[in-house]
């Protein structure tokens, strides 16, 4: 007997079902089931994937949803006592009308009815029931709940649904009954009781529902509430439930596990994908309930439309004024408007200078004719294929952004190959001049809608998206949902935590998963140590097996970083929408690929901070010089720019800041924009291997050879090396007479490694090349090289567009360094490390970075004649609203004349005394009083005087005469310097760093700068590039000292936070070194040291081997240093193999401590510690909370591993004996260490 599963959950019922769509459908194929429904909880997330997978496997897909129905109104969001938040209801799509209604219902459940879960109500259901089949759902449905109450309630509920859905309403019966043998395996009495109570309810409901339904003429269907695939998947499912609840399903006690009664669990272990035979046995007394599932399936004949585009349309303004028009008239008008914009672009974009560049590229050709012919080709394809609206919509958004001063990038992706996009201003790089092809953007041989991605200034991105919403309607625009999945490492950690497996073991397994893209299976195959653990350790094997079952499960939802969907009418006419967690904007329920496949237009709005920097710099330059620079018009042959690159001074240059890029720029010495394009394409995994040849060929150190003379014009600009995908297209055209469209088809086939297609293309290429007079063996060799190259070839259009950004930033740095570095500092002011490097870069270019000044500084860092003036907004503790107030008053009433003048004019509603003190210490008032301590004393008196008088004036206490007196006899505040306590220069400098994030006016190392060349020191910025085991000399400033006690040996050690003039880093001083050098470990002390580079773990670590106070360094100290240095270099400092260090990460473990050891310290053994122990311990600490600080120290193999230092949650009662007794009684692997500081 055929049975159709109609109540099924996939992993899109997030953290409530384990079935992937692929395996779910495969199981239906195994059972030879002809149709299958998907009814995830409250959403349609997986509908398109499910539909396509079913179609691929010749199974009829039935798209449905188990909706949540509010007991009253969906707008009622108060939980009544003994009242359910929502009841369950199954809806299945019969046809397209039903699909639209289900999309709308699911959407409104999120946007209107969300309360714990997305909910509809009966009122909404009554309005949108057409085309839907309704099933009464499980025990959580209102029908089942009514059956448990009374026959009268049941009949009333059934009649309501029957009246609404007529013959398309089916009552639903389920029976998740196990054999007594299976029930006997339940470990807990309460679990058995839950099971029997559950089955008793199901039997009672089934009996009542079947009888009443029969009497009312309502057909019934038998379903199984599927949440996992196989009978033995129940445990993986239970683990998944408790990944969500964060309860361990069991807890360790002595040498065994005790089930956790607080865990989430299903009452039966029968929620798997049963076979038709199993269902037939369960419902043998009611075979019609099985037959009726086939009737439901027969009524469902939804066909999703993957051909129609639901793109928005563009109506030219002239046509809007007309009022009424046909679609033919509208498209004709849109086409004409597009052509009109292009004609305007021909005049404004193709200047004589640009046409001259094209003429130079194509001697003997009329450049404007070439442009017009190219435009004619592009227009014919774009207009005939109905793409005008798409281009005009993108043009409209970009044009609005530019009109409103929001910087937009010069192009991204293959769109930079289109002349039409260049004329419209969508891109800013001329394609003919740089051999960029339209066919790479839209291939005439295989026409499909292209992607046009938009780079936008980070600050203006939200405004642009809001414009798109306003322009096209809030119901027509949404962001795109994303689904976060359990990768291998996360699955191991989630499962290990839920099984309460020892943390050290869990993290040991996780550490052996090599990277984010690795699977557990591949890790087992590649790692003998992990494989051996799997064989030898049953506990580890259980974690791995369960994690394999859950690997890839969806864990959470998010929002796509850039993608926005724009539809021509309300989205819910075509797709469901939702509101993802932690998001305020509407999002699609379908992820990126499915949502595009059903005809939605995706536009990527990518925030690019570099554009913000360019905008700030060019505005500053315009203000200073009257010259408005634009990326599209700056000269591409500027010698200052190339000279800067030759020096490798690429800090602050887009995509060229890395050490590798600096070296590439110095070695290549680019002298043409085309070489900058090539740099962007070459510096990636794969083609990076060709960089040495590329450099050598440019400088004549390596011969440039071509496999055939026809390849020389194509590969000449890249010195005979294939770098771009477009070169494959050109070679195919030149040697084998491919059209550019055919060449793009070849490129795609090579990139996808489509073996079947490649066999055809090889034969086609070689035969056509032979017809063109090319030797077959040469043709085969060339094809082989093209095929190998295609796996890493780069899109030249994208490289050119981004190359223009690179060149623009280099041009700004070379010609307007102060303005450019000031702009970068403004963009990155909250990234202290970046600010430090930019300031160092400014110093290297002989540009001073000056402290903030009350009359020169504003919100941004600003270029002045003297240097770069620090931003007021970047001073810690001074908000932008205060800065706005200061600047507004300055612009309105002129510069501040003195500290008193400033305080007198300050708005005390916005400015506090503490903020003014911060401004003083930051140097903001040095122009009036360079002695900061004296300025603070004056400020204190001024603030008190004027704030009091302004308050009195505001309340009317001061009379007209007293105010007049104040005006005639202004307040005079004088403070004698002798009465002011003066801070030391070191203290002032430290305070400066606290407020500005960097040492600005001076650095403690300035005094010893002359010594450094003689000390052979390596700066911190070079550490990252050094190999494991390298011994180095360095100099640093101690910023912070944290003293600790090792748990194993009870010996003191220290963690230092240290820095040089640019970088900061952490440096441990272990017990043996600490005993020797403890007297040197003082904050603000300069140290000369020998360090060893340790790369045995995943990250760079440093180990200190010798140190001295830098102020004591003399010839004998240098000799001692040299002796230690030589000895360490001759030794094998570290083993070359990486050792397993056990636990690598945990939410409750910090590898870096920032507080001193506490009076009470408890040591926990990671080898025996379980997640449940931490829960118990946390509860006990709360139970015995008090004023005594507590630290937890984690050990592994008797070695200190990590610790948790005191915070608000780790203070216990002074009398800790009771706490310690309870800890001992719980079998937590803990011991109390000495309680002295």
From Swiss-Prot:
Q: Which GO terms describe its molecular function?
A: 3'-5' exonuclease activity; DNA-directed DNA polymerase activity
Places the protein is found:
Cytoplasm
What's the catalysed reaction?
Answer: DNA(n) + a 2'-deoxyribonucleoside 5'-triphosphate = DNA(n+1) + diphosphate
The record's Gene Ontology biological-process terms are:
DNA replication
Gene Ontology cellular component list = cytoplasm
The answer to whether the entry has keyword Nucleotidyltransferase is: yes
Q: Is Nucleotidyltransferase among this UniProt entry's keywords?
A: yes
What EC designation does it have? 2.7.7.7
**Gene3D superfamilies in the record:** 1.10.150.870, Bacterial DNA polymerase III alpha subunit, thumb domain (1.10.10.1600), Metal-dependent hydrolases (3.20.20.140)
Instruction: Give the UniProt keywords, A-Z.
Output: Cytoplasm, DNA replication, DNA-directed DNA polymerase, Nucleotidyltransferase, Transferase
Question: SMART domains attached here?
Answer: POLIIIAc
Describe its assembly.
DNA polymerase III contains a core (composed of alpha, epsilon and theta chains) that associates with a tau subunit. This core dimerizes to form the PolIII' complex. PolIII' associates with the gamma complex (composed of gamma, delta, delta', psi and chi chains) and with the beta chain to form the complete DNA polymerase III complex.
Task: Report the protein's function.
Answer: DNA polymerase III is a complex, multichain enzyme responsible for most of the replicative synthesis in bacteria. This DNA polymerase also exhibits 3' to 5' exonuclease activity. The alpha chain is the DNA polymerase.
Q: Which family does it belong to?
A: Belongs to the DNA polymerase type-C family. DnaE subfamily.
The record's section on NCBIfam families has: polc, PRK05673.1
Q: What is this protein called?
A: DNA polymerase III subunit alpha
Species source reads Chlamydia trachomatis serovar D (strain ATCC VR-885 / DSM 19411 / UW-3/Cx)
């Amino acid at each position: 007997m055929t049975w159709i599963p109609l109540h099924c959950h996939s992993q899109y019922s997030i953290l409530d079902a384990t079935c992937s769509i692929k395996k779910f459908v495969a199981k239906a194929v195994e059972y030879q089931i002809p149709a299958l429904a998907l009814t995830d909880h409250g959403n349609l997330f997986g509908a398109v994937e499910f539909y396509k997978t079913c179609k691929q496997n010749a199974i009829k897909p039935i798209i449905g949803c188990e909706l949540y129905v509010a007991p009253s109104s969906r707008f009622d969001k108060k939980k009544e006592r003994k009242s359910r938040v929502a009841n369950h209801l199954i809806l299945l799509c019969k046809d397209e009308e039903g699909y639209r209604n289900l999309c709308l219902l699911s959407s409104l459940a999120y946007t209107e009815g969300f309360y714990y879960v997305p909910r509809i109500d009966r009122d909404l259901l009554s309005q949108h029931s057409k085309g839907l089949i309704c099933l009464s759902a499980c025990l959580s449905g209102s029908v089942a709940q009514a059956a448990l109450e009374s026959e009268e309630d049941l009949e009333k509920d059934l009649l309501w649904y029957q009246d609404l859905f007529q013959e398309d309403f089916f009552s639903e019966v389920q029976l998740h009954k196990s054999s007594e043998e299976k029930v006997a395996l339940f470990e807990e009495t309460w679990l058995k009781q839950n099971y029997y109570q559950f089955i008793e309810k199901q039997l009672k409901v089934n009996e009542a529902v079947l009888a009443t339904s029969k009497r009312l003429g309502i057909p019934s269907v038998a379903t199984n509430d599927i949440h996992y695939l196989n009978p033995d998947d129940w445990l993986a499912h239970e683990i998944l439930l408790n990944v969500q609840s964060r309860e361990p399903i069991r807890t360790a006690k002595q040498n065994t596990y005790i089930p956790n009664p607080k865990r989430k669990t299903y009452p039966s272990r029968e929620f798997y994908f049963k076979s038709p035979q199993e269902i037939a046995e369960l419902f043998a007394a009611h075979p019609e309930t099985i037959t009726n599932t086939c009737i439901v399936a027969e009524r469902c004949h939804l066909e999703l439309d993957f051909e129609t585009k639901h793109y928005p349309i563009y109506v030219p303004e002239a046509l809007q004024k007309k009022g009424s028009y046909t679609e033919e008239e509208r498209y004709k008008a849109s086409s004409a408007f597009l052509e009109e914009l292009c004609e305007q672009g021909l005049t404004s974009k193709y200047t004589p200078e640009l046409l001259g560049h094209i003429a130079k590229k194509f001697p003997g050709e009329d450049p404007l004719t070439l442009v017009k012919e190219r435009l004619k080709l592009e227009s014919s394809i774009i207009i005939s294929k109905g793409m005008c609206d798409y281009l005009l919509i993108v043009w409209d958004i970009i044009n609005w952004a530019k009109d409103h001063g929001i910087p937009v990038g010069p192009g991204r992706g293959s769109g930079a190959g289109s002349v039409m996009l260049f004329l419209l201003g969508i891109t800013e790089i001329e394609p003919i001049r740089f051999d960029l092809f339209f066919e790479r953007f839209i291939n005439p041989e295989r026409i499909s809608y292209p992607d046009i991605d938009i780079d936008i200034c980070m600050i203006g991105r939200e405004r642009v998206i809001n414009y798109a919403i306003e322009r096209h309607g809030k119901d027509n625009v949404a962001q795109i949902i994303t689904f976060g999945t359990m990768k291998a490492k996360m699955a191991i950690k989630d499962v290990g935590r839920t099984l309460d497996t020892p943390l050290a073991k869990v993290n040991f397994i996780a550490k052996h998963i090599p990277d984010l893209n690795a699977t557990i299976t591949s890790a087992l195959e590649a790692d003998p140590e992990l494989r051996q653990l799997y064989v030898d350790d049953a506990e580890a094997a259980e974690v791995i097996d369960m994690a394999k079952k859950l690997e890839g499960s969806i864990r959470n939802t998010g929002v796509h970083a850039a993608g926005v969907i724009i539809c021509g009418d309300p989205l819910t006419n075509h797709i469901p929408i939702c509101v993802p967690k932690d998001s305020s904007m509407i999002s699609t329920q379908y992820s990126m690929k499915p949502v595009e496949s059903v005809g939605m237009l995706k536009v990527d709005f990518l925030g690019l901070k570099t554009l913000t920097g360019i905008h700030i710099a060019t505005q500053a330059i315009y203000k200073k010089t009257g010259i408005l620079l634009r990326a599209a018009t700056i000269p591409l042959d500027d010698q200052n720019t190339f000279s800067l690159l030759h020096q490798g001074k690429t800090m602050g240059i887009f995509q060229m800041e890395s050490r590798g890029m600096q070296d590439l720029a110095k070695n290549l010495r680019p002298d043409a924009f085309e070489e900058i394009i090539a740099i962007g394409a070459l510096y990636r995994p794969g083609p990076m291997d060709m960089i040495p040849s590329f450099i050598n060929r440019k400088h004549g150190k390596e011969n440039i050879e071509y496999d055939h003379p026809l390849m020389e014009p194509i590969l000449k600009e890249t010195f005979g090396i294939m770098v771009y995908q477009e070169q494959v297209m050109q070679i195919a055209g030149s040697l084998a007479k491919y059209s550019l469209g055919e060449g793009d088809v070849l490129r795609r086939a090579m990139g996808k490694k489509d073996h079947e297609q490649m066999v055809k293309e090889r034969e086609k290429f070689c035969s056509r090349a032979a017809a063109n007079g090319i030797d077959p063996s040469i043709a085969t060799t060339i094809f082989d090289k093209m095929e190998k190259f295609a796996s890493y070839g780069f899109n030249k259009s994208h490289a050119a567009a981004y190359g223009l950004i690179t060149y623009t930033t280099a041009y700004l740095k070379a010609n307007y360094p102060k303005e450019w570095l000031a702009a970068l500092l403004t963009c990155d002011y909250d990234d202290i490390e970046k600010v430090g490097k930019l300031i160092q870069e400014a110093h290297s270019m002989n540009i001073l970075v000056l402290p903030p000044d009350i009359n020169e500084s504003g919100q941004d860092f600003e270029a002045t004649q003297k240097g770069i003036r620090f931003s007021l907004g970047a001073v810690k503790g001074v908000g932008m609203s205060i800065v706005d107030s200061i600047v507004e008053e300055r612009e309105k009433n002129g510069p501040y004349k003195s500290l008193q003048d400033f305080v007198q004019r300050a708005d005390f509603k916005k400015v506090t005394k503490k903020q003014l003190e911060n401004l003083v210490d930051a140097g903001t008032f040095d122009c009036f009083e360079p002695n900061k301590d004296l300025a603070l004393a004056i400020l204190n008196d001024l603030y008190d005087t004027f704030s009091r008088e302004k308050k009195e004036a505001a309340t009317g206490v001061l009379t007209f005469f007293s105010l007049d007196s104040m005006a005639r006899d202004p307040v005079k505040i004088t403070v004698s310097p002798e009465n002011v306590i003066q801070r030391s220069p070191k203290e002032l400098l430290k305070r400066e760093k606290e407020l500005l994030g960097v040492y600005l006016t001076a650095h403690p190392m300035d005094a010893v700068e002359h010594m450094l060349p003689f000390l052979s020191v390596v700066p911190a910025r070079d550490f990252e590039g050094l190999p494991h085991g390298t011994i180095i000399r360095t100099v640093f400033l101690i910023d912070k000292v944290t003293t600790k006690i090792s748990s194993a040996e009870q010996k003191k050690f220290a963690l230092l936070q240290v820095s040089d003039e640019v970088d900061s880093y952490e440096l441990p001083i272990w017990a043996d070194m600490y005993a020797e050098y403890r007297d040197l470990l003082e904050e603000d002390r300069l140290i000369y040291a020998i360090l060893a580079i340790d790369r045995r773990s995943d990250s760079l670590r440093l180990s200190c081997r010798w140190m001295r106070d830098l102020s004591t360094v003399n010839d004998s100290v240098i000799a001692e240093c040299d002796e230690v240095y030589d000895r360490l270099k001759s030794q094998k400092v570290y083993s070359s193999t990486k050792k397993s260090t056990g636990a690598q990460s945990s939410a409750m473990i910090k590898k870096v401590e920032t507080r001193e050891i506490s009076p009470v310290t408890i040591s926990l053994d990671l080898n025996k510690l379980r997640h449940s122990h931490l829960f118990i311990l946390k509860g006990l600490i709360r139970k015995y909370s008090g004023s005594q600080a507590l630290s937890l120290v984690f050990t592994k193999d008797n070695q200190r591993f990590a610790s948790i230092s005191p915070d608000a949650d780790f203070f216990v009662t002074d009398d800790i004996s009771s706490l310690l007794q309870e800890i001992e009684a719980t079998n937590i692997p803990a011991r109390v260490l000495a309680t002295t500081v």
